[in-house]
Amino acid sequence: MVCADIEGGISIFRFTNVLLLIDGSEATTLDEMQQTLRAIWAAEQPVPWRSGTMEAMARFLRSLRGRQDWRGNVGKRAWVAAKYVLRCLTLLRGHLDFLAQIEGEPALLAFRRRDPRMLERHLHRYLTRGWRRRQRLDAIRWHYHHALAAMPAAVFRAVYVEGIARLGLLMLKDGGHLELGLRPPIVFGCEGELCIQIGDDSGNPLYRVVVTVIDADTLAIGCIQGPDGGDARETVRALTRNLHGLRPRCLMLALARALARHWGLSRLLAVGNAAHPLRNPRRRFVADYDAYWEEQHGRETGDGWYELPLHPQRKTEADIPSQHRSAFRKREAVRIEAERLLSDAMNAMPRRHRQHEAHAVEPDFGPLLHGICAEAS
């Protein structure tokens, strides 16, 4: 197994050198590159444990295509591509397995076309500053393994391919509505893989919580974020009044808890201030997550996370002064309706994973190389 990893790394490194030569030298032709790749492929055939190397190389090559997240001129994109390759080599076997997972699921492959950054989120800061690349990759792979099995196919596609799954409307005090939806992570996002969002009548996002299923038992919260801008504070106040006094971030936390319970997960973690991936010692970190998690009876775990109760103790109507009971009932009605909309969206029969068997054939690198060179020109 170790030999296979080493040989796979050497093959991809040799292939990357060819790719960089083509980028830097006008004298190198596509035909010459294809001949080089075929020679590598032919040289690897006699050894049985190398049989999957060229297929992995082909996947790796495809991961360099359609990279609209690599911006700038040709030189800058080539430099970003080179860094991507070198980072991949530090986690070669895991990264190649991830590429195989993506190409083995049509819905994931469609999401990769929409957001190519998903190919390398684990190679950058992600979810918590305390994780290494292997932990980031394991969490991301587990999330999509779980989401494909637990989310109805139509909902998964709406979220990750079309960009939003609209779950329904919540009635506000002034007669208006909030739209509850699910979204994929933002471009260059580092706080998680699934966004639960409320927005206004016009579709503008107001509040969101970003979550990730990081293992068989755990849902992790990477952020709870409200509106920004100069009038953000007043927007939150107005929204709280329209929710009969229910704070929007409490509604978002309730939805994260509801999702974890619906999916049968037993732990809810939330990242603290010090471990947040966007924390910068040279810049003030605006959100005070620690205070909010402690307010919500979170317990610090000692590794940058807070563990939150999945079933918090809630006040009953008897605990509320009589003059405030009407507003309390309305707040609870909004929360319960939001949780119902989320659960109803997830209630269809889970989609089972399909097993794909790969057959070793000599790959045709021509169309792939033409595509890459066309994008780089």
Regions found by a protein language model. Give the residues of each.
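Conserved acetyl-CoA-binding loop-helix of GNAT-fold acetyltransferases
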Residues: A238-T240, H244-R257
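Short, contiguous, well-structured surface segments enriched in hydrophobic/aromatic residues
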Residues: I221-C223
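A residue-level signal for beta-strand positions that form part of recognition/binding surfaces
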Residues: T218
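Terminal substrate-recognition subdomain of acyl/acetyltransferases
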Residues: F15-I22, T29-E193, Q197-Y207, V213-D215, ...
